[in-house]
């Protein structure tokens, strides 16, 4: 993502189709968000308006352009990166928007031995195609099976205990109180 990226650059646009000799009409040209796995690099470099368009599509699983709704493919997942907030040209994501992501992993520099491995791999010819182990129809089927499984009361209690003990204002765990600013929202449950 870049500062000049507009919402329609990721969502899509209506374009004038003049391929017919008798009439012109607008047709929707889908943007990159219409994929099952969207890799969004440096999302906090985009303007808040563009960030909002991406995050709204993540929440609603659809896009609205020119008053028309377009469903996103299923499954739909977003992997995103952010630049550190203290870098110039970044727009911080509000907590309500960060909450749409399942996890936030801070990555530091690798150890020298690991970095050496990265350097060696980056100079190899890696033209071997990775093996396909799952297609999206199977993933949807497995998700449906998991959703249909009965969940016992003890599991709900266990999940809520984990969530409650991850919130600094409701836990007795000292390290959580000292190191966690914002606990998980109900969406995490």
Label each region the model flagged.
Residues 117:
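Acidic, glycine- and histidine-enriched catalytic cores of nucleic acid- and nucleotide-handling enzymes
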Residues 1-6, 102-114, 129-133, 148-151:
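Conserved AAA+ ATPase "SRH/arginine-finger" region at the nucleotide-binding site
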Residues 12, 120-121:
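Phosphate-coordinating loops and pocket residues in cytosolic domains that bind phosphorylated ligands
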Residues 97, 105-108, 125, 145:
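Interdomain coupling/hinge region of P-loop NTPase helicase/AAA+ cores
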Residues 122-189:
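Basic, amphipathic alpha-helical bundle interface domains used for macromolecular binding and assembly
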Residues 1-99, 103-105:
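Conserved ASCE/P-loop NTPase catalytic core
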């Amino acid at each position: 993502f870049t500062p000049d990226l507009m919402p329609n650059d990721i969502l899509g646009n209506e374009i004038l189709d003049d391929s017919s000799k008798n009439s012109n009409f607008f047709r929707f040209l889908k943007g990159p968000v219409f994929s099952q796995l969207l890799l969004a690099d440096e999302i906090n470099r985009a303007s808040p308006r563009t960030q909002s368009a991406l995050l709204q599509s993540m929440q609603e699983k659809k896009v609205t352009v020119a008053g028309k709704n377009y469903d996103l493919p299923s499954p739909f997942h977003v992997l995103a990166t952010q630049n550190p907030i203290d870098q110039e040209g970044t727009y911080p994501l509000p907590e309500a928007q960060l909450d749409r992501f399942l996890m936030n992993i801070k990555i530091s520099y690798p150890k020298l031995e690991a970095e050496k491995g990265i350097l060696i791999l980056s100079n190899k010819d890696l033209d071997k195609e990775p093996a396909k182990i799952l297609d999206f129809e199977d993933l949807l089927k497995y998700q449906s099976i998991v959703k249909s499984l009965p969940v016992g009361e003890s599991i709900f209690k266990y999940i809520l205990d984990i969530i409650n003990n991850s919130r600094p204002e409701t836990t007795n765990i000292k390290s959580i109180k000292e190191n966690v600013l914002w606990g998980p929202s109900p969406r995490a449950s």
